[in-house]
A protein has these predicted regions:
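Catalytic or ion-coupling anion/metal-binding cores of large enzyme and transporter domains
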Residues: 1-199
């Protein structure tokens, strides 16, 4: 898991296993383009939305997809990820630290919860270890429900990204899980308000 804190011994073990696997992939002729297919990017959108991931993710993943000849846009982030619940209570919007997230099960636990609720759109896509994402994560459990919530008791119901467009820009992404009630009331509720944000 990418959430392993740097000082942990597991981090070094993971780095070693990663290097070993890369060599095996060369011998197997398993290339990044075999793994990074449209369906894998759709899964990434879902997981990023459920963990309250960075607004940098759409920029970078869209660019990586485009480099591979896959069309992925900000509108895809809204279409695929907006309806997703926020499951991770992590700073800066939440209470807990990255180390707590790792101890609670990390990304594999979030994926497992999404799988149990049929929210991961493409559970059978292949991963770098030769197993599907479902095979890798389906048995992982949430070890701390204060840090990683269940779909039935999320932090927020609709927490993905929305794609904005208007006369100032063609496309901009907004992370809805960090929108507070106060911000929504002040800037997003009354279109006649002079301070309202209009898209």
């Amino acid at each position: 898991s990418a959430s392993i804190p740097a000082p942990y011994r597991e981090r070094g073990q993971m780095a070693y296993q990663t290097g070993k696997r890369i060599v095996d992939m060369v011998w197997e002729d398993l290339k990044p383009s075999d793994i990074m297919i449209r369906e894998a990017f759709e899964n990434a959108i879902v997981v990023n939305s459920a963990i309250g991931g960075s607004t940098n993710a759409p920029i970078h993943l869209n660019a990586i997809a485009r480099h591979l000849g896959i069309e992925l846009s900000n509108q895809d982030w809204q279409n695929i990820g907006y309806e997703l619940p926020l499951l991770v209570n992590l700073q800066p919007a939440g209470e807990y630290l990255g180390e707590d997230f790792h101890k609670a099960g990390g990304v594999p636990a979030v994926i497992s919860e999404l799988l149990k609720n049929n929210l991961l759109p493409n559970p059978n896509v292949n991963t770098v270890n030769g197993l599907s994402i479902s095979e890798n994560c389906k048995e992982v459990i949430i070890k701390n429900p204060d840090v990683i919530k269940t779909v039935n008791y999320p932090i927020k119901n609709k927490a993905g990204f929305i794609n904005l467009s208007g006369n100032l820009f063609e496309s901009a992404i907004m992370k809805t899980c960090v929108i507070t009630k106060n911000f929504q009331d002040q800037f997003l509720s009354n279109p006649n308000d002079l301070n309202a944000i209009e898209g």
